Amino acid sequence: MDRVTRLASQKAVVVFSKSSCGMSHAVTRLLRELGVDARVVELDEEPAGADMENALAGMLLAGTAANGGGRGRGVVVPTVFIGGRLVGSTDRVMSLHVAGGLVPLLRDAGALWV
């Protein structure tokens, strides 16, 4: 978990992804189209990728439990951090975007200048 936390705080937006995941590509494309230069960590290309994936699963599980939801330990990619804080996966990022909350969050984190 330390490695995940350290990586997540190194840039305004960090996406933990897998190179073969379509949803990961969708989220990174959305961020890119908004003008965000996100750091993308491809877990399937990292030597410690499996350990990081387990850490992310635990973080997501803790986050959904704290929010009254139950996502379980299924799919963990993409997992998005903005401003060093866990935002969540595709559903959360897209919900924020549709509701108009993603851009202000990105601005507050310094990921957008406009």
Swiss-Prot record:
Under which name does UniProt file this protein?
A: Monothiol glutaredoxin-S8
Whose protein is this, by species? Oryza sativa subsp. japonica
Which SUPFAM superfamilies does the protein's record reference? Thioredoxin-like (SSF52833)
Q: Which domain of life is it from?
A: Eukaryota
Keyword line:
2Fe-2S, Cytoplasm, Iron, Iron-sulfur, Metal-binding, Redox-active center
Q: What is its main location?
A: cytoplasm
Gene3D superfamilies assigned to the protein according to its UniProt record, in alphabetical order: Glutaredoxin
Q: Which family does it belong to?
A: Belongs to the glutaredoxin family. CC-type subfamily.
Where in or outside the cell is it found?
A: Cytoplasm
Which GO terms fall under molecular function for this chain's record?
2 iron, 2 sulfur cluster binding; metal ion binding
- Ranges for domain Glutaredoxin: 1-113
* Role of this protein: May only reduce GSH-thiol disulfides, but not protein disulfides.
**Can you quote a single GO CC term?**
cytoplasm
**InterPro entries, A to Z:** GlrX-like_pln_2, Glutaredoxin, Thioredoxin-like_sf
- Which residues are involved in binding [2Fe-2S] cluster? C21
- Lineage, opening ranks: Eukaryota, Viridiplantae, Streptophyta, Embryophyta, Tracheophyta
